[in-house]
Design a protein with these regions (language model features):
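N-terminal secretory targeting modules
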Residues: 6, 10-13, 19, 28-207, ...
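Catalytic His-Asp segment of secreted/periplasmic serine-dependent ester chemistry enzymes
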Residues: 287, 322-394
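Surface-exposed amphipathic alpha-helices with a cationic face
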Residues: 302-310
Length: 394
């Protein structure tokens, strides 16, 4: 990576205090969802404040497979960055504190009517209309919704689906309880992002698996490691959590979604105002059948992500693979693959910077295990304290 200039939006050294945004160059999109003729909205630059990655439904996912008719879905979601204009914001941004919602159905087979929709009880419009047709495979963005929200605020999104929708793209578990009508759900259907005015900050996207998604941390506590990083980033970059449980970097899976290489364009490059990619995948390539036992293949996949991210002028932070002794599929042979991958990553030639998750989480008495106070109980997934250790290592 020597000689390659990247926009670094996270300052400092590993374990140090994070710096602010460096520079003002952005690679985001303008508000394509703005009401026609609304020049003010069209000039706003947006940044992803909350995001999730979608998968296709399987036979085990009854709601996503059957879809909905005459149903209201409700979600309470934690934003990383708010809409409150910072000191020195331009007049346009000060005049238009707002959010924008993004919906997508990449795995759908038929058009879906979405709406009416509200955000914190305020109507969400689409080109001035109360609903929108979301074509199969398409993405739509809403008009700006005027809301003043601090960093770390919760946004309540209510979405009516007249249906019948047919099967829907969704995220299986966002570790926050919403509702389908009068019953609870941890799944989010169709909604993929919540954007806020960029106000000089860029987005950190985390491409990960169940550890990033939040398995091992309590629901509704917002203590996943990207959440805890976002809390440290106040008035700095926004954080988009693109973790999918079971996800790999190499292989696609019917239940656990397209692998990191396959979903890179849609999930990562689809984010507005992106500046940095954190890639934290690999443990499922090793431990999940069919196990990848050649470290070179995993490293090659990482290299491909780096090449593609650099093509879009993104800084890339790569994570070592954490310990998993005690997990149901642990073997010493698989752990050697993990250590071989980590040894190459620590040489510092692959990524722009390294997030040493392994060093942050391992038991000093047995490097193959999680520290006891970081173990959620299954040997693989860190608890909230372990998630904090990852956040502090960035």
């Amino acid at each position: 990576m020597s000689g390659v200039s990247r926009r670094s939006i996270l300052g400092g050294t590993a374990g140090g205090v994070l710096g602010g945004v460096v520079g003002s160059s952005v690679s985001g999109t303008s508000s394509a969802g703005a009401t026609a003729g609304n020049a003010t909205a069209a000039r706003l630059r947006w940044a992803a404040s909350w995001a999730t990655a979608q998968t296709a439904p399987t036979a085990a996912d009854a709601d996503a497979t059957s879809g909905f008719t005459d149903t209201t879905l409700r979600y309470k979601l934690r934003l990383s960055a708010g809409t409150t204009p910072p000191a020195g914001a331009d007049a346009l941004t000060r005049a238009r504190p707002a959010v924008r919602l993004r919906f997508a159905n990449p795995f759908g087979a038929a058009p879906v009517v979405v709406g009416p929709v509200t955000a914190n009880a305020k109507p969400v419009l689409f080109g001035g209309a109360k609903d929108v047709v979301l074509a199969a495979g398409a993405t739509v963005v809403s008009d700006p919704v005027g809301l003043i929200l601090p960093d770390g605020a919760d946004l309540v999104v209510s979405m009516y689906l007249p249906g019948p929708t047919g099967p829907l793209s969704f995220h299986r578990n966002v570790h926050a309880t919403g509702s389908i009508g009068d019953r609870a759900t941890n799944s989010v259907f169709l909604l993929t992002g919540i954007d806020v005015p960029a106000t000089g900050r860029q987005v950190v996207a985390v491409l990960g698996d169940s550890i990033t998604e939040g398995v091992g941390t309590p629901d509704n506590a917002n203590l996943r490691w990207p959440d805890q990083d976002a809390a440290r980033f106040r008035r700095r970059p926004a954080v988009a959590n693109l973790g999918i449980s079971g996800n790999r970097v190499l292989l696609d899976d019917g239940r656990f979604g397209p692998g990191g290489q396959s979903r890179f364009d849609r999930d990562v490059l689809g984010l507005p105002n992106l500046g940095t990619l954190v890639t934290f995948l690999g443990i499922n390539d090793i431990q999940q059948p069919p196990s990848q036992t050649d470290p070179a293949r995993i490293l090659q996949a990482y290299q491909q992500l780096v090449h593609r991210a650099h093509d879009h002028d993104l800084e890339v932070i790569g994570a070592t693979i954490g310990p998993f002794k005690g997990w149901i599929r642990y073997t010493d042979a698989l752990d050697r693959v993990r250590n071989d991958v980590n040894a190459v990553l620590r040489q510092g030639r692959l990524f722009d910077r390294l997030l040493d998750v392994d060093a942050a989480l391992r038991d000093p008495a047995d490097h193959a295990r999680l520290r006891p106070d970081f173990n959620s109980g299954d040997g693989l997934h860190p608890n909230a304290a372990g998630a904090k250790a990852i956040a502090l290592a960035l």
